[in-house]
């Protein structure tokens, strides 16, 4: 929520999901042909016992923020502002890790590398 509040102050970007935040991570594709996306089981805390997980042992929630922007620069700025807002919360407020998916290039030509964005 802190990231959404910070990013909503910027022009040219929207976070299209209600409230701006999506529970659990998503991935491109599904075992059902009609579905374009599905939950990313590696980042879904509720099924960690039945699938390979990428989560830390004490992670109980994964949140995803989808950003749509007019330009690549607009999206990079929104990502930076959002990550800075989340980092200010820190581990004591529950932040363990920030990651980004690239989906193997299946969602477009742009790749946003977090370390580069935060420089």
State where each predicted segment sits.
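Conserved mixed alpha/beta catalytic, RNA-binding, or beta-rich assembly cores of soluble enzyme
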Residues: 1-64, 68-112, 116-119
């Amino acid at each position: 929520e802190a990231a959404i509040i910070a990013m909503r102050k910027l022009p040219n970007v929207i976070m299209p999901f209600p409230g701006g935040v999506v529970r659990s991570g998503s991935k491109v594709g599904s075992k059902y042909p009609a579905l374009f996306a599905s939950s990313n089981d590696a980042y879904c805390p509720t099924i960690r016992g039945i699938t390979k997980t990428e989560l830390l042992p004490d992670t109980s929630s994964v949140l995803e923020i989808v950003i749509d922007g007019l330009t690549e620069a607009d999206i990079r700025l929104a990502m930076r502002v959002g990550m800075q807002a989340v980092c200010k919360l820190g581990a004591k407020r529950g932040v363990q890790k920030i990651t980004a998916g690239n989906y193997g290039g299946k969602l477009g030509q742009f790749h946003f590398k977090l370390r580069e964005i935060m420089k």
